[in-house]
Amino acid sequence: MAWNEPGNNNGNNGRDNDPWGNNNRGNKGGRDQGPPDLDEVFNKLSQKLGGKFGGKGGKGPSFSGGGAIGFGVIAAIAVAVWFFTGFYTIGEAERGVVLRLGKYDRIVDPGLNWRPRFIDEVTPVNVQAIRSLRASGLMLTKDENVVTVSMDVQYRIADPYKYLYRVTNADDSLRQATDSALRAVVGDSLMDSILTSGRQQIRQSTQQTLNQVIDSYDMGLMIVDVNFQSARPPEQVKDAFDDAIAAREDEERFIREAEAYKNEILPKATGRAERLKKEAQGYNERTINEALGQVAQFEKLLPEYQAAPKVTRDRLYLDAMEQVYSNTSKVLIDSESSGNLLYLPIDKLAGQDNKTAQPRPNKSSSAYDQIELESQTTETNTDTQSRSTTRQGRY
């Protein structure tokens, strides 16, 4: 016989039994045992609370006197707990997005704030942190070559509400937009430009395309910087491209060296040409003046020559010979002389041998067959000589 099944058990006819031998006397009137009555449970709870706080008697719940006070105390404690748990803090670099009953309400600033708990929901968002993502992969160029390109994008959150609720996942959306923009820009560029001189243009074009995508989708993000990390050809042709790049770098280096040499030597050559030009002009003027002086001197001697030609010729000859022999140490003696005693200053003659040859102060233009220009190796030694008014030459 099952438990609580009606039957004849030790004279308990028509009464329910339980395994402990107790009769279910509380279930009188022939009612079957079922789930507890909620009204009865609440009534019993109210009676217990009423008795504990001073309520007596009565079959129903008593809300007067001490029972009301007890409920008031419990309610006050619950309200206090609810109120104090509503305080929260937003960091200095954060902004809080408040949703009231699931609908956007406002954005709160950093500091201590309060919200009605279970009504408002606050999501803090860092708006000052610089975030980074990388896009890379094999990409097809305009000239149908394949390159491996890698690019880093740095960004931050400009609008917390748009960042959270305008798109499903703003970070993932930006990653996909970066990959798409980079592939579009690389697809419009030549491989040689990507590997060498066109990286700056690719970086600027990618950043401009990303800004257009962010504005069109209203993501609430701001691009801080775009860094072109690397671009390399496939491994199968990497050696050939490295040789081509090295040759191009050598070409650029040689061009820079040539430009530097030109910038160094051109001012020197220009200055030297100007100096030689001025010296030539000075020599021209000096030669003309000397010739005019000689002409004037001969014109002055012309009346004397016409009066006594032989005497004037002899005097001019002696003056010329004296001028010629004055710069030499050789002494000419007439062997047919009358034997007169000659005085020869040996010390002065020996001193003239040790002297360096000095240029003649007056030279005619016919004496200069050519002018020897200074060489570059002796330029420093002839700077002081070039300042003099008399130009040295060979004749």
UniProtKB/Swiss-Prot annotation:
One GO CC term, this protein: membrane
Membrane topology term: Single-pass membrane protein
The keyword Signal appears for this protein: no
Name assigned to this protein: Protein HflK
Cellular localisation: Membrane
Gene this protein is translated from: hflK
Subunit structure: HflC and HflK may interact to form a multimeric complex.
Statement: the UniProt record of this protein carries the keyword Lipid biosynthesis: no
Functional note: HflC and HflK could encode or regulate a protease.
Keywords: Membrane, Transmembrane, Transmembrane helix
SUPFAM superfamilies from the UniProt entry: Band 7/SPFH domain
Biased composition (Polar residues): 353-395
Protein family per UniProt: Belongs to the band 7/mec-2 family. HflK subfamily.
Coarse class of the protein's main subcellular location: membrane
InterPro entries membership: Band7/mec-2_domain (IPR050710), Band_7 (IPR001107), Band_7/SPFH_dom_sf (IPR036013), HflK (IPR010201), Membrane_HflK_N (IPR020980), Stomatin_HflK_fam (IPR001972)
CDD domains linked to this entry: SPFH_HflK
Transmembrane segments: 67-87
Segments of skewed composition (Low complexity): 1-26
SMART domains: PHB
Alphabetical list of NCBIfam families matching this protein: hflK (TIGR01933)
Naturally occurring in which organism (per UniProt): Vibrio cholerae serotype O1 (strain ATCC 39315 / El Tor Inaba N16961)
Chain intervals for the UniProt region annotation (Disordered): 1-40, 352-395
Pfam families per UniProt: Band_7, HflK_N
